Design a protein with these regions (language model features):
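Terminal low-complexity tails and localization/encapsulation signals of metabolic enzymes
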Residues: 1-51, 84, 88, 125, ...
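Residue-level signal for inorganic ion chemistry
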Residues: 46, 78, 82, 104, ...
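Conserved C-terminal structural/oligomerization subdomain of aldehyde/semialdehyde dehydrogenase
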Residues: 47-51, 203, 227, 264, ...
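Short, well-ordered beta-strand elements within core beta-sheets of diverse protein domains
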Residues: 48-55, 70-76, 154, 263-266, ...
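Structural signal for hydrophobic packing residues in well-ordered secondary-structure cores
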Residues: 71, 75, 90-97, 101, ...
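Rossmann-like NAD(P) dinucleotide-binding subdomain of oxidoreductase/dehydrogenase enzymes
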Residues: 136-273, 398
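ALDH superfamily catalytic-core signature
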Residues: 237-378, 441
Length: 476
């Protein structure tokens, strides 16, 4: 049985996007020193949403100086006073959540259901969570009176713009640091709206500074001599470059990089439940997730049954307008990312894997890619080794738990994994054997601000979230 869904669009009118935005430095919006701007577009239709200032080295220096000046008073505030600001920010995010969700879907391309029901609740939850820690740092296990580091330079990606901002800013402020944050070039708007929330909350000037720009802006921020802490989420290639820049300095560094997660399904797993977990694991946020379950490892005895059910489920996925509440898969974030996804999918075919995608009518304008499944994949295929960062699933098989572990660990990355089985002892054994920072049991892509997140190998180092996330912003 198939169902037809009438469009159920969220109103774009709930968010007011200005024609242009400056940099947020020392509590005020200002033009870039060089006067340069760039356009941010909607990936769903390539419409220009706004013009945004391009920060130069001079702007980076101004922002870092503002953060350094604010640090003296901010770090001296009692934790309970800092907590009041964080609680206020969290409540303002909740009050403006509909506006922010629409903005995120417009600028990023993700479905409104995801930005509304997943991203925004987690954003607020992170500020609430770390507000609770601000006056309890002496009980976090890092000494009786842990001290902040100073100025934190933070660079975030385009896949979860506002959520990654919360992951970084909330613990930094709770610990008494000040922040200079650079959002991704293709998704700057939610960070600029957050700057306005900081003003609404009465946050002291200079405590949070937002610099928009391209990779050169991020490089200037990372290299600035008065930055004490660098936190980066993004590609492994850029992460390695940042590590080289920071090497030999006294900067503290956290890197959360790429992944090639294995979603492992054993023969005793409930098929329908596993299929939902597989779909959520790879097609959530168009596969633009560092911990996406982009490799499906299925036990040979249930391969046919599982793939048949998975294809049926994929055929029901709706691709289209991110603001339509019925949409399951939105737009790819940029033309560059779409080109990379296409190139790796083509490589999968040319290397001998069998490609399948459901019948899917894609919009003419914008950047789109149908949910895609590859079978007959081997460990040597590029689609089994390289991060695609799109809605592409590579299927491999295994016979024994030992073989599943060997295949799952045979990747440069070590960020996440999922295990589907009814045997608790098997789950515990697998979790101990898998070289992954996060292992989900009979679920996937579940996040909580109280739970640490991070990986091994080329997936980076350090942890964000939970009590462990405080350590990155304390002098311990």
């Amino acid at each position: 049985m198939s169902f037809e869904y009438a469009p159920a669009p969220e109103s774009r009118a709930v968010v007011d996007i200005a024609p242009s935005y400056g940099l947020f430095i020392d509590g005020e919006f200002a033009d870039a020193a060089g006067g340069k701007v760039f356009k941010t577009v909607s990936p769903a239709n390539e419409e220009v949403l706004s013009e945004v200032a391009q920060a130069s080295a001079e702007d980076v220096d101004r922002a870092v100086k503002a953060a350094r000046k604010a640090f003296e008073k901010w770090s001296a505030l009692p934790g309970a006073e800092r907590a009041k600001y964080l609680f206020r920010i969290a409540r303002l995010i909740q009050e403006r959540s509909r506006e922010l969700a629409v903005l995120e879907s417009l600028d990023n391309g993700k479905p409104i259901r995801e930005s509304r029901d997943s991203d925004l609740p987690l954003v607020a939850a992170h500020f609430f969570y770390y507000a609770g820690w601000a006056d309890k740092l002496g009980h976090a296990g890092y000494g009786a009176d842990p001290k902040p580091l100073g100025v934190a330079g933070q660079v975030i990606p385009w896949n979860f713009p506002l959520l990654m901002l919360a992951w970084k800013i909330a613990p930094a402020l709770a610990c008494g640091n000040t922040v200079v944050l650079k959002p991704a070039e293709t998704t700057p708007l939610s960070a600029l709206f957050f700057a306005d929330i900081c003003r609404q909350a009465g946050l002291p000037k200079g405590v949070v500074n937002i610099l928009t720009g391209d990779g050169s802006t991020g490089a200037e921020l990372v290299a600035h001599p008065d930055v004490n802490k660098v936190a980066f989420t993004g590609s492994t290639e850029v992460g390695k470059a940042i590590a080289r820049t920071v090497a030999g300095t006294d900067k503290k560094l956290t890197l959360e990089l790429g992944g090639k997660a294995a979603n492992i399904v054993f023969d005793d797993a409930p098929v329908d439940q596993a299929v939902e977990g597989i779909v959520n694991g790879i097609f959530f946020n168009q596969g633009h997730v560092c911990c996406a379950g982009s490799r499906l490892l299925v036990q040979e005895s249930v391969q046919d049954e599982l793939l048949e059910a998975l294809k049926r489920r994929m055929s029901t996925l709706r691709v289209g307008d991110p603001l339509d509440k019925n949409t399951d898969i939105g737009a790819i974030n940029s033309a560059e990312q779409l080109a990379r996804i296409k190139a790796l999918a083509d490589a999968g075919e040319s290397e001998g894997a069998e490609r399948w995608a459901p019948a899917c009518e894609l919009p003419d304008a914008g950047y789109w890619f149908a949910p895609t499944l590859f079978t007959g994949v081997t460990q040597a295929h590029r689609i089994a080794q390289e991060e695609i960062f799109g809605p592409v699933l590579s299927v491999l098989t295994f016979r024994t738990p030992e073989e599943a572990v060997a295949k799952a660990n045979n990747t440069p990355y070590g960020l996440s994994a999922g295990v589907w089985t009814e045997k608790g002892s098997r789950i515990l054994w697998m979790a101990n054997q898998l070289r992954a920072g996060i292992v989900w049991s009979n679920t996937f892509n579940k996040f909580d601000p109280a739970s640490p997140f991070g990986g091994y190998k080329e997936s980076g180092f350090g942890r964000e979230g939970g009590r462990h996330g405080l350590e990155a912003y304390l002098d311990v």
